[in-house]
């Protein structure tokens, strides 16, 4: 599935035309994860569908979801913009940016510098760079370019080997451990426990995917996560605000 997604993304980039610059203000994704509302930060994801689960929220309303997250004191938002596989849109991100005060992560498969400029123009405050998708050198180059454009970067890894290759080149400020294997789609929060000791102490560690319960949250926090990225378990509920409260045991 990952290979299909990347192949489709490469095709898309061939004909990608940059949108007009929305001249959005920049908000610090990193600062929001340092100064969190709770003892562990929350990046709440606006997500309609996924290739492994299909439609997650049939009554999808991106702006209402984002407002519910903001009301529930999510520290940052993550917005899916990949259309073919996740039914996301750039327009969702821009719309949310206009109405919500939280920093926004653009959740997509960034493989080319044109997508970084696109991210800036549509209002993203941060982008995702995936270690299992990019060669370490290419990831580093895209990281530097994003920084130069005023964006924060969440560098995501699944495997220890991937993280080690990246750390041999440079140390990202924010490292995300994807608890989901992108090849098999198997998910376990044990992955955060396994990878956390390899993450430099001055990095922010984000645990991503598979966090469904207060116990999951407690587990990844205990093993060093500064923040969690949660999408599906929140999006499946009729009220995202209540879902966040339940997740945090409130």
Curated annotation (Swiss-Prot):
Pathway the protein contributes to: Amino-acid biosynthesis; L-tryptophan biosynthesis; L-tryptophan from chorismate: step 4/5
GO biological process: L-tryptophan biosynthetic process
SUPFAM superfamilies: Ribulose-phoshate binding barrel
Reactions accelerated catalytically: 1-(2-carboxyphenylamino)-1-deoxy-D-ribulose 5-phosphate + H(+) = (1S,2R)-1-C-(indol-3-yl)glycerol 3-phosphate + CO2 + H2O
Keyword Amino-acid biosynthesis assigned: yes
Glycoprotein keyword on record: no
Keywords: Amino-acid biosynthesis, Aromatic amino acid biosynthesis, Decarboxylase, Lyase, Tryptophan biosynthesis
EC number: 4.1.1.48
GO terms, molecular function: indole-3-glycerol-phosphate synthase activity; phosphoribosylanthranilate isomerase activity
Family: Belongs to the TrpC family.
The protein's name in its UniProt record: Indole-3-glycerol phosphate synthase
Naturally occurring in which organism (per UniProt): Bacillus pumilus (strain SAFR-032)
Gene: trpC
């Amino acid at each position: 599935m990952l290979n299909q997604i990347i192949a489709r993304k490469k095709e898309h980039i061939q004909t990608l035309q940059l949108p007009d610059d929305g001249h959005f203000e920049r908000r610090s994704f990193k600062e929001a994860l340092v100064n969190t509302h709770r003892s562990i930060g929350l990046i709440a994801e606006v997500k309609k569908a996924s290739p492994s689960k299909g439609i997650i929220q049939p009554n999808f309303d991106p702006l209402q979801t984002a407002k519910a997250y903001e009301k529930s004191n999510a520290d940052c938002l993550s917005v899916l913009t990949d259309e073919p596989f996740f039914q996301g849109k750039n327009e969702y991100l821009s719309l949310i940016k206009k109405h919500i005060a939280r920093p926004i992560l653009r959740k997509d498969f960034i493989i080319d510098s044109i997508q970084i400029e696109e991210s800036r123009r549509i209002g993203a405050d941060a982008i995702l760079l995936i270690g299992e998708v990019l060669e370490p050198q290419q990831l580093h180059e895209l990281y530097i370019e994003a920084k130069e454009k005023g964006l924060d970067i969440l560098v995501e890894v699944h495997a220890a080997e991937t993280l080690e290759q990246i750390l041999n080149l440079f140390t990202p400020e924010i490292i995300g451990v994807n608890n989901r294997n992108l090849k098999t789609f198997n998910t376990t929060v044990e992955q955060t426990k396994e990878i956390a000791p390899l993450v430099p102490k001055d990095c922010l560690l984000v645990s991503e995917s598979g966090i469904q319960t207060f116990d999951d949250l407690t587990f990844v926090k205990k093993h060093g996560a500064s923040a969690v990225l949660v999408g599906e378990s929140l999006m499946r509920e009729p009220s995202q605000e209540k879902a966040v409260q339940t997740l945090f045991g409130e």
